[in-house]
Structure formats: C-alpha cells, structure tokens
C-alpha cells in the first residue's frame, strides 16, 4: 500500500528526483492534480530528456464550491483553517477562477514543453483515456 510522505503536492521535487535517478530516455507518466507552483524549470528539462505525459486526475466535485453556507475549510497542503461563506458569489467566483487558472497553467506548460496531456476524472476509466491517447499519438 502506498502512503504519501506529505499531503502537499510537490511536482518539482518529483521531477528532480526522476531526472537524477533515470539516466536513459524513458516514457514517463506524471500523475497529479497539478495544483502546484514552481515546477516550470524541472518540467522543461524533464520534457526534453523523457517522453513525458502529464495525467491530471481530478474530481468533478472539486471544480466548484456548492452553496452550503458558512463552513470551515482546511487547506490540505498548508493545514490552515478558514471559515468561508460558500453562499458568497465572490467566494465561489474566486474559487472557480483559481481552479480554472491551475488547469490552464497545466495545459499551457505541458504544451509549451512538448509534453503529452491527459485529463482523467476519478470516475472515468483511465484505460479508455490511455487507449485514446495512444491512438492519437500513433
């Protein structure tokens, strides 16, 4: 069973580890929600060295905040607790804007560096997604 060392996403650290450990050309699949910063440099290097594909795993429920009133929200990565009014249009708009910005960043960084992209919801068949991806590349 896999147990993460940390709840914080650190794509840069993962890519740097990969660059140090794997010396030959390889096909690499990087699975993440890609809600992270500061991995541009290591992504650029890794995408030149490897046949790299980013697989963004996401839950459709995470794309928007439902209107359920004032709720405590703990940032899973920082551990910070905040009370948030989910009925607020501004709160929901800011959340959606930030979420969409992360997705666009992932797509633009991977495209810019010539890396492959797969988006896969947690309730979808990853096998179908991979087969479709390989058919497009063939």
Where are these regions (language model features)?
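Von Willebrand factor type A / integrin I
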Residues: 17-24, 44-138
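Short, well-ordered alpha-helical microsegments
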Residues: 37-40, 127
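Domain-scale detector for complete catalytic domains at protein termini or as standalone homologs
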Residues: 28-32, 115
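Active-site glycine- and acidic-residue-rich loops that bind
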Residues: 31-37, 52
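Von Willebrand factor
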Residues: 1-26, 36-38, 58-59
């Amino acid at each position: 069973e896999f147990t993460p060392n940390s709840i914080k996403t650190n794509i840069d650290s993962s890519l740097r580890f990969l660059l140090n450990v794997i010396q030959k050309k390889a096909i690499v699949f990087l699975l993440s929600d890609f809600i992270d910063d500061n991995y541009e440099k290591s992504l650029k290097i890794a995408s030149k060295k490897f046949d790299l594909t980013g697989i963004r795993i996401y839950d459709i429920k995470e794309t928007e905040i439902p209107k359920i009133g004032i709720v405590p929200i703990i940032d899973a990565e920082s551990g910070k607790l905040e009370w948030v009014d989910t009925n607020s249009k501004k709160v929901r708009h800011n959340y959606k804007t930030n979420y969409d910005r992360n997705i666009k960043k992932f797509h633009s960084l991977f495209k810019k560096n010539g890396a492959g992209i797969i988006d896969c919801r947690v309730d979808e068949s990853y096998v179908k997604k991979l087969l479709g991806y390989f058919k497009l590349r063939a």
